[in-house]
Amino acid sequence: MSLTKADMAERLFEEVGLNKREAKELVELFFEEIRTALENGEPVKLSSFGNFELRDKNERPGRNPKTGEEIPISARRVVTFRPGQKLKSRVESYAGTREEQ
């Protein structure tokens, strides 16, 4: 199962008491702020969750898996996410309980 923006809005509606329109707008604005910051080259730091940052990748050689032909992979900018320590700890403890089942 994956978490969608609609799921997040529904949770805000149920648990915070926002109406559905407000909940949807809040979720959209949250992601728009992240997009805008990244578009402006700014890192996004969400306390206890993690950081989104832009990273420039240089051009590098690649290979077409079907033909084996070497082809260049162009330079590009990518978004990276580094989880915070609290998120890592929670995920690791959850993963440990699933392995025991």
From Swiss-Prot:
Protein name per Swiss-Prot or TrEMBL: Integration host factor subunit alpha
UniProt-listed HAMAP family: IHF_alpha (MF_00380)
Taxonomy, superkingdom: Bacteria
Record InterPro entries: Hist_DNA-bd, Histone-like_DNA-bd_CS, IHF-like_DNA-bd_dom_sf, IHF_alpha
UniProt keyword GTP-binding present: no
NCBIfam families tied to this protein: himA (TIGR00987), PRK00285.1 (NF001401)
Record-level GO cellular component terms: cytosol
Subunit structure: Heterodimer of an alpha and a beta chain.
Gene: ihfA
One annotated GO molecular function: structural constituent of chromatin
Keyword list, A-Z: DNA recombination, DNA-binding, Transcription, Transcription regulation, Translation regulation
Free-text function comment from the UniProt entry: This protein is one of the two subunits of integration host factor, a specific DNA-binding protein that functions in genetic recombination as well as in transcriptional and translational control.
Pfam family, one: Bac_DNA_binding
Keyword DNA-binding among record annotations: yes
Family matches, as SUPFAM superfamilies: IHF-like DNA-binding proteins
A GO biological-process term: regulation of DNA-templated transcription
Family per similarity comment: Belongs to the bacterial histone-like protein family.
